[in-house]
Amino acid sequence: MKVYDGSQTESPEQSTPERIKVGIAEYKVTTEPAMLTTSGLGSCIGIAIYDTRNTVAGLVHVMLPSAADIDGGNHAKFADTGIQALIEAMADAGASTEAMEAKIAGGSDMLDFSENGSSIGSRNAKKVRETLDEHGVPVVGEDLGGDHGRSVKLEADTGNFIVKSANTDSITL
């Protein structure tokens, strides 16, 4: 930093973390101080998983609860297989499942096409919680439900999960 009295002091350059876009039915993992982002979370859910010990972070954008009735296809599209794929990719990058924590957002009741009155958003939320529990990953923050869309950002170096929606201020989980 330049000081105008003739002296100079050095300060470390502050760099903006890399922005990694996670599309619908995709997941990404990083060990770098990046910002993982996804948008368009209506009934979809963004699941951020962070390893608090090894600084490995991942984000998946799931659309539907279960791949049980689907043969093949994109695993990241479904809560059960998308979360499993994300956890496996994080473990491959050096994460420990014992140190993982999850934060989740989305699951809005945007549309109701079900016969039993249960919306896709609420079924997604239920399956996300069940799947994380099966893998021993606690949910430490969530912003679910409502009737509005969301966008999220995961700060990979801190685990902060920033949720933005049209009708509220940003919140950090």
UniProtKB/Swiss-Prot annotation:
Keyword flag Hydrolase: yes
GO terms for biological process, alphabetical: chemotaxis
EC number: 3.5.1.44
Any one Gene Ontology molecular-function term assigned to this protein's record: protein-glutamine glutaminase activity
CDD domains xrefs: CheD
Catalysed reactions listed for this entry: L-glutaminyl-[protein] + H2O = L-glutamyl-[protein] + NH4(+)
Task of the protein: Probably deamidates glutamine residues to glutamate on methyl-accepting chemotaxis receptors (MCPs), playing an important role in chemotaxis.
Designated name of the protein: Probable chemoreceptor glutamine deamidase CheD
Protein family membership: Belongs to the CheD family.
Sorted UniProt keywords: Chemotaxis, Hydrolase
Enzyme class: hydrolase
Gene coding for it: cheD
InterPro entries named among the record's database cross-references: CheD-like_sf, Chemorcpt_Glu_NH3ase_CheD, Cytotoxic_necrot_fac-like_cat
